[in-house]
Amino acid sequence: MNDYKQTVSDLIAEHYRYQQEVAHKDGLLTMCEASGPHQNQSDALLCQKYSDVPMGEFWARSKTHRISLKQRFLTKEAVSAGHIYGKNVISAESFTSVGPQWEEDPYFLKPTADRAFCEGINKLYFHTYPHSPSLTAKPGFVYYAGTYINRNTTWWNYSLDWNTYLARNQYVLQQGTPVVDVCIYYGTGIEKRIQYKQDSALMDLGYQYDYVNSDVILNQMSVQDGKICLPNGISYELLVLPEESGISIEVLEKIREMVYDGATIVGPRPICSIGLYK
């Protein structure tokens, strides 16, 4: 069964790879919200590998829906993919909401934007900016699920400072190399979407973390001076293994090699392999 699921996952990732290949032939880039938030049968990190601009999403504050941070910030997949695959621009569908409507303002939205920046998002796409023809009645035709930001918003003419603040943060955060403490291996990545909803406990304790997949462990990771390093300059202090009894032989062999090279590994000891070996 594992091999069947892995095949399905690989075929989905191949779809994203081919889409990117076709786009590049025409001088275009791809931006894919390939991380959900809904469950699918694929390694979403691998799908984001083939997105030039990985994309997540986060929701505005509300007392009626998606109340907790884990429900609101669906960003860690896209951020992790950006880090492990060397993509400096990491975007998000931003301030999504199904209410309150026409009540949000910059003062209300700023803490949410700041949290998204701290999570690793550095490019915002307002969800939504309704394009309403000038002849329609104000505030215009809108999509039901969004924080409505457009020229018909009452505070639009006073929003220069707010937009400048967002723009400056995005520019600065797209520079340099991210500093991340821990990488968490999520196994095959199939049927693991729950792990991607923001694990606020780690961040609230002051630790940054990325998720990594088998592809990155096998093809990109090395150990230098006790740190787990990637070719793009990002390094981690330790690798955390998933709470699973089985890991593929290929990944186990690479992890053993990393331990011999001085890497720190934390997690339960695997007791079996998964799938057919080679």
Q: What kind of region is each of these model predictions?
A:
Residues 1-54, 59-278:
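Carbohydrate-binding surfaces of carbohydrate-active enzymes
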